[in-house]
Amino acid sequence: MNAVITSLVFISLVGVGYSWRYPRNADQTFWAFRTCQRQSEGAKSLREWYRWNLPNDEDTHCYVKCVWLHLGLYNEQNKSLRVDRIMEQFNSRSVAIPGGINTISGPTDGTCKDIYDKTINFFNNNVNDLRTAFYGIKKLSDEWFTQNSNTKPKGTKISDFCNAENREKGGADCQHACSAYYYRLVDEDNEPIHFRNLNILGITDEQFASCVKASKNKQGCKVADTMYNCVEKHNSQALKILDNQSPTY
């Protein structure tokens, strides 16, 4: 019951709508995969996920939901997948849209298990194309990073990248525009990522929601500054932990 109340409070404070730009790039998909894997570091199936195998167990069910959500492909309002965006991602990567893509359309009950059941056959039937479309093959991912040197490289800490070349200013007079984005406190449009789960870093959902609320009347990279300062105020070690993890997200 407490978990339900917490969830309702969180949603009432921050809302459930978000609309990320599509297609997603290799940095954004890499963050999604690594973030969801890190949130379940003790899972027995973790090594299977690295190989893009999704066994039928409870941890994997929630890993699948996590990935869809962090790719911007799960609509929390109607509890369904954004099939149009999946198609857009395939098109952007010159990958043929799978014939069975409509099998994953329509609502779920929102549980990890139901989302897994809804999508696992589609995943298994198209895993190689999905890996290509979402940069899930190391060679393709590395090629993208090489071609996009304005993005934080793999193996580089967020602090090292963002403190160089005045990146923290965000093209304005901000202080944490770059870091707040790469810590994924905000998205590429400086909108707070309301579902960001920092519990394992000592930031509760209620605390994060209060940061989102504090940023409500800010504009542009001032939203990023507000989110950064608020999270740091709640737990000064949280962002340091993220920074130490950031060479591999």
UniProtKB/Swiss-Prot annotation:
Example GO molecular function: odorant binding
Single GO cellular component term: extracellular space
Pfam families: PBP_GOBP
GO terms classed as biological process: sensory perception of smell
The keyword Disulfide bond belongs to this UniProt entry's keyword annotation: yes
Keywords: Disulfide bond, Hemostasis impairing toxin, Platelet aggregation inhibiting toxin, Secreted, Signal, Toxin
Compartments, record wording: Secreted
Binding, leukotriene C4: 52, 136, 154
Disulphide-bridged cysteine pairs: 36-66, 62-112, 162-178, 174-221, 211-230
UniProt similarity note: Belongs to the PBP/GOBP family.
Name of the protein in its database record: Long form salivary protein D7L
Lineage: Eukaryota, Metazoa, Ecdysozoa, Arthropoda, Hexapoda
